[in-house]
Amino acid sequence: MQMKKALAWSKNNATVNILKMVGIQHFVDFAKKLGIVSDLHAFPSVCLGADAISVIEMMRAYTMFPNYGINPKPIYITRIEDRNGNLLENFVPERKEVINEVTAFKMIRMMMGTVLFGTGRRLKPAYGVEGECAGKTGTTNSESDAWFIGYTPQLLAGAWVGCDDRFIGEGLGEGARAAMPIWGLFFKRIQADNKLGYNAIDKFDKPSIMEGLDECDAVDEISLQRAAAQLNVTRGEDDMADPNDEPGETNKFDPADKGTEDNDYK
C-alpha cells in the first residue's frame, strides 16, 4: 500500500512499520526538533498519539508543511505601538529549516488526500471550506482524544476535544466527528469575514525545483477512489453514524505491542 493512501485512511499499520524503519529514538529526536516539549516515551505507540501533547505543540510541528520546511517558534505578540501608532517593539519568530521544500510539498499533497477522500472528506461539503486545504484527523484509545490539525496556504489551525482523564471515552469522539467540525466552522467564519483579507482560493505553490518533474506521487481523485475500493472502505471515522453503530477506526495500540508485519507496507 502506498503511504499516501494509508495516510488518507488512517491505516495505522503503515505508520507503525515506518516507525520501525526509521527507529523510535530517531522519531522522538525529530519530534523534539519540531518543538514538541512534552515527554515522549520510546514505545511503538508514540507514533499513534499515545503521549499527551498540547495543541500548540502539534500546531508548531505541522507548520513545517505549509511553510515548505521552515518551522517557526510561535509568538503571541508581533508588535507594540504607542497611542500615536509609533512602533515601540517588533517581534519576529525564530525560524529554522527542518525538512527540505520538496519533502514538505509532497507531504502537503499527501495530506490533501485526507480532506479529499480520506477520513476528513466531509470537511468541505459539510462546512463550506473553500480552496486547497490539507490536514489529519486523529483518535486515541477509547476515543478519549479527538484531533484535527489542518492548514491552507495562508493559515494553520488545530482542534482537540477530550478530557484530562484519558480513561474517559467519548463514544463517538473520533477526530472527524468531534474535532474537525470545530476547525471547519472556524474556517467558515474566517472566509466570511472580508476584513481579514483571507484568500480562500489560494493554492499551494509547487517548489520551483520541481517544475518540469512528473509529480507521480501526488494525491489525485482517481488514485484515492481506487484506494478506497481496494480497502473496501464503506465507513470512515467521519461518517455521522447512529449512536448504536460501532465506532469507526481509532488508533488503538498497546504500548507493549511491537506492531504487525505486512509486506505490503515495506
Predicted regions and their residues:
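Low-complexity, Gly/Ser/Thr/Pro-rich intrinsically disordered linker/tail segments
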Residues: I209-K266
